[in-house]
Amino acid sequence: MTAKIFIDGEHGTTGLQIRARLGERRDIELLSIPVERRKDPAARAEFLNAADIAILCLPDDAARESVSLIANDTTRVIDASTAYRVSEGWAYGFPEMDKSQSKAIAQAKRVANPGCWPQGPIALLRPLVSAGLLPADFPVTINGITGYSGGGRSMIEDYEGKGEDAPEFFPYGLTLSHKHLPELRTYAKLARDPLMQPVVGNFAQGMITMVPLQLGHLPRVPKGEELHAAIADHYAGIEGSAVEVAPFQAIERSPEIEPERYNDTNTMRLYVFANDARAQALLLAVYDNLGKGASGAAVQNLDLMLSGLR
């Protein structure tokens, strides 16, 4: 049986990317709502209920409305908004998070696709907290830079409309109340919200997230090699992982660490740097904010859910 897939919000940034990734596939049938009917709740309900799997690429409130329009027990959902990421009954769509997560996604009725900003720090921190190398109440700070596509259509139009006058970068989220904090705290196994400082750069897509660690106040200070080993061991045990861990090495800089390096892929590459004498470490993730951070993750989750249908 060919699975029917409906992308609710297929004309937005993430929706367009998902459709492009699925366009040549013959194992699925893509349902497409006429443009003039895409904001009609009755039309959306028709397509949502006809789908085997619906992928929601909508703002939070619109995503909640779409879920409410599903009137059967068979349509499964992948939601790319923040609406359900820490909600009971929704599997978190980061298959590499735990050995059992791929199976949980494959069997789930409802899957919450991860946000681009939390996914890198979660990938870096969760193995360390699970291994007991970092306490859950460790004061975590997260820095990073993303392409302007991370702000959706309005930011894309604003940046590209300014041409040469567009800023090279700018910080945002200066109220320190980023919408991804609950998700980050929950899945990184943290006991408190981290301090998160995102930056937008003058490039379309790709991102780097960084977690600096001041380790000197811990009762037992882990060495850099220990941090790296815990992260590497975690992902070595995940079948089909899209997360790579770079070798542990002492380098001043690397041409690999470039935000656009993994654009149009679903790859995330993790790095650990350390100065043991100073009891400091830097954790770093490089990935595509529209790939592993959005559409690539959605397709990865879709494939897992399809495996549960076969």
UniProtKB/Swiss-Prot annotation:
Entry EC no(s): 1.2.1.38
Name the UniProt record assigns to this protein: N-acetyl-gamma-glutamyl-phosphate reductase
CDD domains in the cross-refs: AGPR_2_C (cd23935), AGPR_2_N (cd17896)
GO MF annotation list: N-acetyl-gamma-glutamyl-phosphate reductase activity; NAD binding
Taxonomic source organism: Chelativorans sp. (strain BNC1)
Subcellular location per the Swiss-Prot or TrEMBL entry: Cytoplasm
Family: Belongs to the NAGSA dehydrogenase family. Type 2 subfamily.
Any one annotated GO CC term: cytoplasm
InterPro entries assigned to the protein according to its UniProt record, in alphabetical order: AGPR_type-2 (IPR010136), NAD(P)-bd_dom_sf (IPR036291), NAGSA_dehydrogenase (IPR050085), Semialdehyde_DH_NAD-bd (IPR000534)
Keywords, comma-separated and alphabetical: Amino-acid biosynthesis, Arginine biosynthesis, Cytoplasm, NADP, Oxidoreductase
Principal location class: cytoplasm
Annotated active site: 116
Top-level class of the enzyme under EC nomenclature: oxidoreductase
Highest taxon listed in the record's lineage: Bacteria
NCBIfam families given in the database record: argC_other (TIGR01851)
Catalytic reaction annotation: N-acetyl-L-glutamate 5-semialdehyde + phosphate + NADP(+) = N-acetyl-L-glutamyl 5-phosphate + NADPH + H(+)
Function (record text): Catalyzes the NADPH-dependent reduction of N-acetyl-5-glutamyl phosphate to yield N-acetyl-L-glutamate 5-semialdehyde.
Biological process annotations from GO: L-arginine biosynthetic process
Pathway the protein contributes to: Amino-acid biosynthesis; L-arginine biosynthesis; N(2)-acetyl-L-ornithine from L-glutamate: step 3/4
